[in-house]
């Protein structure tokens, strides 16, 4: 573990992590605890964090505490739980994949603004990290060349499609999810520009995240949960709807959040979590290579390739500053996933 020089948040500082029971959030918590920070994690009920609380009590005694926020849209929802925090990682969001705009986009915006307002009213907060998504920049477009995505890229198309596509369209839920991430992040940057609070905002934009599932009881519906279902021979129709795209290790996503919270040179950045491209046949080929004695489903029909390119210079700077030479490979990420589920 690399020592963090001139960290914005001194070791031992308290960080509030919203939606801490989620798959990505649990990896953010893990990296914060591993690097000497204290974490207060929120969930809609204490039971949703019970297994993770036991894990972290055993590994990092006295450094993780559970806080219940039943409704992130309620006025003042975070006002109490944020007290004493030096940093905030706002990861809680709506992941129902409903195709109804008002059920997904509206609460995503409202929850984000609630957390920002609470931070603005809390003098101890120095950094605020928003978990966005690469879909706030673009939904993958297979076999299309010449797409380059940087910190100025926004998926404004998703907002229109989320409002206008018929509910019968099988892709509508994906566009609604993309709109929720796009609009919530845009609202966050607008809040910062208009209110000029005392803290710094950074955003982390993961793509398909693969890694250890810390709590199978609550995280089976995550991206890694879907991949594990394929490992176990279940071919969900939803998989065929997911285009080729980029993957990223959950470990690396945890580190990117950590870097956005503590590294002094990372300010007002949109940081992509995009290690390399994959499709389901890539995953199946990796399964067969790593576990040759196991039988897996047949390959999917040709899905094409994600030919887009991302500006990952800030991401790689963070990983290097935290002692990582670069991205974890898809093989490492899948080993992390399968090992956690078969141990």
Curated annotation (Swiss-Prot):
InterPro entries: Epimerase_deHydtase, NAD(P)-bd_dom_sf, NAD(P)_dehydrat-like
Biophysicochemical property: temperature dependence: Optimum temperature is 40 degrees Celsius.
Top-level taxonomic group: Eukaryota
Regulation: Inhibited by quercetin and diphenylhydantoin.
pH dependence (record): Optimum pH is 5.5.
Outcome recorded upon mutating residue 22 to A: Results in loss of substrate inhibition and of NADPH-dependent reductase activity
Catalytic activity: a primary alcohol + NADP(+) = an aldehyde + NADPH + H(+)
Top EC class, one word: oxidoreductase
Job of this protein: Catalyzes the asymmetric reduction of o-substituted aliphatic and aromatic aldehydes and ketones to an S-enantiomer. Reduces ethyl 4-chloro-3-oxobutanoate to ethyl (S)-4-chloro-3-hydroxybutanoate.
UniProt protein name: Aldehyde reductase 2
Organism, as annotated: Sporidiobolus salmonicolor (Yeast-like fungus)
């Amino acid at each position: 573990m690399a020592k963090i020089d001139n960290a914005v948040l001194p070791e031992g500082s308290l960080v509030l992590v919203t939606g801490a029971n989620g798959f990505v959030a649990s990896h953010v918590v893990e990296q914060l605890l591993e690097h000497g920070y204290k974490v207060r994690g929120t969930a809609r009920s204490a039971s949703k964090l019970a297994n993770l609380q036991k894990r972290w009590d055993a590994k990092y005694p006295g450094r993780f505490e559970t806080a219940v926020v039943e409704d992130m849209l309620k006025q003042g929802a975070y006002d109490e739980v944020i007290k004493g925090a030096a940093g905030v990682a706002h990861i809680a969001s709506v992941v129902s994949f409903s195709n109804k705009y008002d059920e997904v986009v509206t609460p995503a915006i409202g929850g984000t603004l609630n957390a920002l307002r609470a931070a603005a009213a809390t003098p101890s907060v120095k950094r605020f990290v928003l978990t966005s998504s690469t879909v706030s920049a673009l939904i993958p477009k297979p076999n299309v060349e010449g797409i380059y995505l940087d910190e100025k890229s926004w998926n404004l198309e998703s907002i229109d499609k989320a409002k206008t596509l018929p509910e019968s369209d099988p892709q509508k839920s994906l566009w609604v999810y993309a709109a929720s991430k796009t609009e919530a992040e845009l609202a966050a940057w607008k809040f910062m520009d208009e209110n000029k609070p005392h803290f710094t905002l950074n955003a982390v934009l993961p793509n398909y995240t693969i890694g250890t599932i810390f709590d199978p009881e609550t995280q089976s519906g995550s991206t890694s949960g879907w991949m594990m279902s394929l490992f176990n021979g279940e071919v969900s129709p939803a998989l065929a709807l997911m285009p080729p795209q980029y993957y990223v290790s959950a470990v690396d996503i945890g580190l990117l959040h950590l870097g956005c919270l503590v590294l002094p040179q990372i300010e007002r950045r949109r940081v992509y979590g995009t290690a390399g491209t994959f499709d389901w046949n890539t995953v199946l080929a990796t399964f067969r290579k790593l576990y040759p004695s196991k039988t897996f489903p047949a390959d999917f029909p040709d899905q094409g390739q994600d030919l887009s390119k991302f500006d990952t210079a800030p991401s790689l700077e963070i990983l290097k500053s935290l002692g990582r030479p670069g991205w974890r490979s898809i093989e490492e990420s899948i080993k992390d996933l399968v090992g956690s589920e078969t141990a």
